[in-house]
A protein has these predicted regions:
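Perimembrane loop-to-helix junctions flanking transmembrane segments
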Residues: 47-63
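Alpha-helical transmembrane segments and their short interhelical loops
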Residues: 110, 118-198
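Aromatic- and glycine-rich beta-strand/loop motifs that create alpha-glucan
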Residues: 1-32, 97, 112, 297-299
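Junction motif at the cytosolic side of a transmembrane helix
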Residues: 242-300
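Hydrophobic alpha-helical transmembrane segments of multi-pass membrane transport proteins
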Residues: 31, 64-142
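Hydrophobic alpha-helical transmembrane segments of multi-pass membrane transport/permease proteins
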Residues: 14-48, 67-85, 126-129, 187-195, ...
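Transmembrane helix segments
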Residues: 34-44, 174-235
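Short amphipathic alpha-helical coupling elements at transmembrane boundaries
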Residues: 6, 10-14, 97, 101-105, ...
């Protein structure tokens, strides 16, 4: 275990030493929250107000708080996954510059080497996304704060789950890559497409029934819904406190993807947590077996 920790610390130091990669990873959440607030806030607001009956009046603070919670939840859902591809660059760099050849003739097993890559990816991703979370809390405080301490802790738990999910996924995808250009191309594709697939850019409830059914098989759907449920929990509690009709509140929950459906059944929060834990375990097992395969420059 001491060897694994030493490898993890070595990878983390390389991440901090590469100022370009560090700056890119740290600035990504800032850019995302600016883009989300600029281009998606109005879309989210229109989607939310469309579910409110004309005879019911909701304060601007509650509307802004709802939109901000949805926006920040979407940002965190995307950031926790895409950032892992940025910080996982060390695995590919070691193959590109020949460092893996030195590791391969050392007494350290390939399993420990790849576990070190994985743990450093998790640690660095948590650090970057912690910054994103602080920015999100500041945005919520400005727009409309309805979270309590328990909600914040649940969101932190969600963030850890999503980072673990993203780290296993990025480790599997990055394993066969041997150049930084390949990883950059993969990162670009993931950054561009993941937000649509997981329902961050546009609620899945706005898609056609066929696409909704297809996306219900992906764990990313439940990852986004999970963090939305905890981010919006205080908002829904405020609506109940003000005695808004239950039908309206449920319609809003459906519109915001807080009630994902699988084969006609609504998936609950505990089930979403189970899906994410199961996905992490499955991808972790796949990563383990993948690392046993020869990979050219990096194989043993």
């Amino acid at each position: 275990m001491r060897t694994v920790l030493a490898l993890m610390n070595r990878n983390r130091k390389l991440f901090f030493k590469d100022k370009g990669m560090l700056f890119t990873s740290m600035i990504t959440p800032v850019i995302l929250i600016v883009l989300y607030a600029t281009f998606l806030a109005k879309v989210f607001r229109d989607s939310f107000t469309a579910a409110i009956p004309d005879m019911i009046t909701i304060s601007d603070k509650l509307i802004n708080g709802t939109v901000a919670a949805q926006l920040t939840a979407s940002l965190m859902a995307v950031s926790c996954i895409t950032v892992t591809f940025c910080v996982n660059l060390t695995m590919v760099q070691d193959k590109a510059n020949g460092t893996r050849k030195d590791f391969n003739v050392s007494p350290v097993s390939s399993g420990k080497i790849y576990l070190g890559y994985f743990l450093s990816t998790v640690a660095n991703s948590l650090m970057v996304n912690a910054l994103a979370f602080v920015l999100c809390l500041g945005y919520l405080l400005k727009m409309g704060w309805y979270l309590n301490a328990v909600d914040v802790l649940w969101v932190l738990f969600d963030m850890i789950l999503l980072v673990l999910f993203g780290s296993t996924l990025s480790s599997i995808i990055s394993f066969p890559l041997t150049t930084q250009g390949q990883l950059s191309a993969v990162g670009t594709i993931v950054s561009a497409g993941y937000g649509f697939i997981c329902g961050a850019y546009m609620p899945i409830s706005n898609f056609g029934s066929g696409l909704q059914k297809a996306l219900s098989y992906l764990p990313s759907t439940y990852a986004t819904s999970l963090i939305k449920n905890h981010m919006l929990h205080g908002v829904f509690m405020e609506m109940e406190r003000k005695n808004y009709p239950d039908e309206m509140v449920e319609a809003i929950r459906d519109t915001l993807d807080c009630n994902p459906v699988f084969h006609g059944n609504v998936v609950g929060v505990n089930q979403m947590i189970g899906i994410m834990m199961g996905s992490i375990a499955v991808f972790g097992i796949i990563y383990y077996f993948v690392t046993l395969l020869p990979d050219g420059e990096g194989g043993r």
